[in-house]
A protein has these predicted regions:
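Extracellular/periplasmic, surface-exposed regions of secreted and cell-surface proteins
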Residues: 1-256, 309, 317, 327, ...
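Short aromatic-centered micro-motifs
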Residues: 36, 274, 282, 312-314
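Flexible glycine-rich, low-complexity coil/linker segments exposed to the extracellular/periplasmic environment
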Residues: 1-21, 118-138, 250-299, 348-373
C-alpha cells in the first residue's frame, strides 16, 4: 500500500513532482431503544449507542453513548379535570443523554504515518538517487471521542384553546475537546499533536409561544415567537500532559501589517469568540489613543445574548399574508473590512471608505487593531413577506381544478441594525473566526418572486 498509494514516495527529487493518495475510514455502530408508556400519562424512553471509529487511537476506538428521557402528561390526571376547560395540555419533560463527535478529524490523525523525508541520497551500489523516508506526524494512541452530556428539563402547555407554550432549560457539558497542541521537540518528533483535553459548558433557556390571537369567520391572526439565551464557558484547556494558557484565534492574516495579529482569545472562564486587544480611548490629532500603552485586554464577545424569531400569519376571506423575521441581540462584530478600507495612507492609489477620508484620521501606523473597530452587531431581519390570494372554489369547479392560489413573496426586505459594515449576520461556522467581518462574504440578496399553486 505504501508503494502503490504513494507514488511520490518513489520519485527522484531532481524530477517533477509526482503525487497520489488514498484514504479510508470506517464507522461501526450498534443502537438500541426501548419505549414505555403507561395510561398515556407516563412516558419513558431509553437508548444506547455503541460506536467505533477507525479515526481514533488504538486504545479508544469505541465509545458508549446512553440517553434517557421521561415525560409526565399532567393534564391527563384526575385532579386536572376541573381545569381542562382552559388547560388542554400540560406536560413535563426531562432528559439526559451523551453524544459523541468525530467531525473534523483526519482519517489517520492518531496513527504513525510514514512518508518522504524531504530529501534524497545517492546509492553508489545502484548508481542512482533514492528517496529518504521517515515518520511524518506524532502518533496519539489515546485519541478518543469528543463527548457532550446534555441535561434538559421542559414543559409544554396549551391554554385557553389559543396559546401554545414550550419552555426548555438545558445544560450541555462537552468533554475531551479535540485540539492541536504544541509539544516539546524532543521528546516528540514534531512540535504539535492532536489530543483530547478541553472542557466546555453551554447552558441556557428556550421559550416558544404560539397564539391564535383572532379566530373569526372572515379574519384570523396567528403569531409565533421564539426566544433563546445561551451562556458558554470554557472550563479547561490543559491537563497534566498537554498545557496551554490560552489559544489565540480570529486571525487578521491578509490585513496590511497584521500577518501575525490575532483578534480573539480562547481562555478558561470565557466563551469562544472573546475579542482580545487594546482599548481605544479616542482620536487626538488624527491618531488613535490606546489605553495602557496598547496592552491587550478583554473587549467583548461575538456570541449573542439573545436570539429571537417572530412570525405572523393573517387570513381575510380568500387572502392570506405571512410575515417572518429573526434577530440577535448583544453580540459584537469586528469590522475587519472597515479597518482595512479606512487606511488613509492608501490614498490616492487605492479606494478607501469616504467617511475615513473625511474623518481626519491620519495615523501612520494604520491599520491599528483595537475596539475602535468593534461594533454592536445586534439586528432584526425581515426575512420574508408573502401575500396570497386563493380563487373561490365556485370559479374552479367547471375546470377540474381543486385549488388555485396566486402569491407574491419578498425576502430579506430590510435589516434594522446600527452596524456599519455590509451585514451584521456574519458566519459563525468557523469557531476560530466567530464575529469577524472580513468583507469576503457574498451579500445576502433581496429577492422578489411571484407564483401560483395549482392542485387537481
Amino acid at each position: 500500500d505504501f508503494l502503490w498509494n504513494n507514488l511520490g514516495a518513489g520519485q527522484d527529487n531532481r524530477l517533477e513532482d509526482v503525487a497520489s493518495s488514498k484514504s479510508q475510514a470506517k464507522l461501526i455502530s450498534f443502537f438500541a431503544r426501548a419505549n414505555y408508556t403507561l395510561k398515556d400519562r407516563y412516558m419513558l424512553t431509553a437508548t444506547i449507542r455503541r460506536d467505533g471509529s477507525s479515526r481514533f487511537g488504538t486504545n479508544h476506538k469505541w465509545g458508549t453513548f446512553p440517553s434517557v428521557s421521561a415525560a409526565w402528561r399532567i393534564s391527563e390526571e384526575a385532579f386536572m379535570e376541573d381545569l381542562q376547560s382552559w388547560v388542554a395540555n400540560l406536560k413535563l419533560r426531562a432528559g439526559y443523554g451523551v453524544t459523541g463527535n468525530q467531525s473534523g478529524i483526519g482519517e489517520y490523525k492518531s496513527a504513525m504515518l510514514m512518508g518522504t523525508g524531504g530529501g534524497a541520497y545517492f546509492d553508489s551500489e545502484s548508481n542512482s538517487w533514492k528517496q529518504s523516508y521517515g515518520v511524518t506526524q506524532n502518533p496519539n494512541p489515546d485519541l478518543k471521542w469528543e463527548s457532550t452530556a446534555q441535561t434538559n428539563v421542559g414543559v409544554d402547555m396549551f391554554l385557553f384553546n389559543r396559546l401554545n407554550l414550550t419552555f426548555d432549560w438545558y445544560l450541555k457539558k462537552t468533554s475531551d475537546l479535540l485540539y492541536t497542541y504544541q509539544v516539546p521537540n524532543p521528546p516528540y518528533l514534531y512540535s504539535n499533536i492532536l489530543a483530547n483535553v478541553g472542557d466546555l459548558t453551554n447552558k441556557g433557556v428556550e421559550l416558544t409561544l404560539g397564539a391564535n390571537l383572532i379566530n373569526h369567520k372572515d379574519f384570523t391572526w396567528d403569531a409565533n415567537l421564539t426566544l433563546a439565551h445561551n451562556k458558554q464557558t470554557i472550563d479547561k484547556l490543559s491537563n497534566q500532559v498537554y498545557q496551554t494558557d490560552r489559544i489565540l484565534s480570529g486571525s487578521l492574516q491578509g490585513i496590511l501589517g497584521m500577518s501575525n495579529r490575532y483578534s480573539q482569545v480562547i481562555e478558561e472562564g470565557y466563551p469562544v469568540g472573546t475579542f482580545y486587544g487594546p482599548h481605544c480611548e479616542g482620536i487626538v490629532d488624527g491618531k488613535f489613543v490606546l489605553a495602557n500603552d496598547g496592552e491587550d485586554e478583554i473587549l467583548g464577545n461575538a456570541q449573542p445574548k439573545l436570539t429571537m424569531g417572530l412570525s405572523f400569519n393573517f387570513t381575510y376571506k380568500d387572502f392570506d399574508l405571512g410575515i417572518s423575521g429573526y434577530g440577535m441581540y448583544g453580540q459584537k462584530v469586528l469590522n475587519v473590512a472597515g479597518m482595512e478600507r479606512g487606511y488613509t495612507a492608501h490614498m490616492p492609489n487605492y479606494n478607501i471608505t469616504s467617511s475615513f477620508a473625511e474623518s481626519g484620521i491620519s495615523d501612520e501606523n494604520m491599520p491599528v487593531y483595537s475596539d475602535f473597530w468593534l461594533e454592536n452587531g445586534s439586528f432584526f431581519r425581515l426575512q420574508s413577506v408573502t401575500l396570497g390570494y386563493t380563487l373561490p372554489a365556485r370559479l374552479l369547479k367547471n375546470f377540474g381544478v381543486n385549488r388555485l392560489r396566486f402569491y407574491a413573496t419578498g425576502e430579506n426586505l430590510f435589516v434594522l441594525t446600527g452596524y456599519t459594515g455590509i451585514d451584521p449576520e456574519v458566519s459563525t461556522s468557523d469557531l476560530k473566526e466567530v464575529g469577524l467581518d472580513k468583507g469576503n462574504i457574498y451579500p445576502m440578496p433581496r429577492t422578489f418572486s411571484i407564483g401560483l399553486n395549482l392542485s387537481f
